[in-house]
Amino acid sequence: MDGRNEKPTTPVSDFRVGSSEQSQAGVNLEDSSDHRTSNSAESKKGNLSGKSISDLGISNNDNKNVRFTADTDALENDLSSRSTETSDNSKGTDGQDEEDRPARHKRKPKVSFTHLRNNGKDGDDETFIKKIINNLTGNQGGLVPGLAPIPSENENGKNDIEKNNRNEEIPLSDLADASKIVDVHEGDDKEKLEALKLEGDVNCTSDGETLGSSSKNSFLAPAVDHFDDYAENNSSDDNEGFIETSTYVPPPSQVKSGVLGSLLKLYQNEDQNSSSIFSDSQAVTTDDEGISSTAGNKDVPVAKRSRLQNLKGKAKKGRMPRLKKRLKTEAKITVHIADILQRHRFILRMCRALMMYGAPTHRLEEYMVMTSRVLEIDGQFCIFQVV
């Protein structure tokens, strides 16, 4: 009986010891004073944790560090696995980029002006910017004249042309155009050829003036007031900045009459000459009739007959100076028209030169107005920029 009672006691003590040891593994260090109580709920947790740890093959001596070491190892394993995955991914992307680089480089189009110009889609889809690019890259020089690309082979030829142009003399007057204008309005008259023979002061011209002097009051007209004529005292706030007292040229009081006014004078002279010739012809006919009548009468004395013949000769001589005067006025009108045309050509040539070498376009009109005032020409100018 005693042996039977002793046998079950040993496992009970062992159980208590095991429970106490297992409970110590599950209890915090601060509660070490109460670790002998084996009937608490913490002992149950210790038993469960002990079973789970024993199942994993971990001894009871390492129970205190099992929970913490397991967590840190898991974190380190996760971080290492992630780093390896990212490194693998980065290597894969780098390899893919290296493989795709030549292909993408080949597929990338070259964006240039020639690509935009020669794409073969010049239709309604063409935008304003594309038109500007086409004009800038064209062979016509774009918006600025004279900037067309010149091949190297033709540069020497261009230099030769420029040298030849420098050596050429610019004629001060050209009567061909003026004579054509006068011929159109004059008619078929053989005596008009003598109009080109310049007489007296017409032949004597200085270096500073063209054929025809500006001192003749017959070819001057009063200046017309235009909207762009600025008074010298009115250059305050309303005028633009480029109009200054040093560059301002006041309009002249008298200007040279234009081509139309000269042609009107030509017609006026023809009317006066025709009327004078008609009156002279009537006078000559009456004188002829009187001479013929007197010649028929034998009773007329010889002195009276000679006087009538002298009157007939004076009438013929009076007709010749009037014809010379008419030819002289026609010559003056021709020279005046040639002078006006020459000044027009000079203004246009100067405007083209300024546009060619980069003068500001918003000031060209003002420059032309000032030049026309200096040349005593009444002119208005409007510049159209070709885009």
Swiss-Prot record:
Species of origin: Saccharomyces cerevisiae (strain ATCC 204508 / S288c)
Read off the InterPro entries from this record. Answer: ThrE-like_N, ThrE/Ser_Exporter
Q: Which family does it belong to?
A: Belongs to the ThrE exporter (TC 2.A.79) family.
Q: What Gene Ontology molecular-function terms does this entry list?
A: transmembrane transporter activity
Q: What else is known?
A: Present with 1480 molecules/cell in log phase SD medium.
Q: Where is the composition biased (Polar residues)?
A: 49-63, 78-93, 275-296
Q: Any idea what this protein is called?
A: Uncharacterized protein YJL107C
| Basic and acidic residues compositional bias, start-end | 32-45, 155-169
Q: Which Pfam families match?
A: ThrE (PF06738)
Region Disordered, annotated ranges: 1-126, 138-169, 275-298
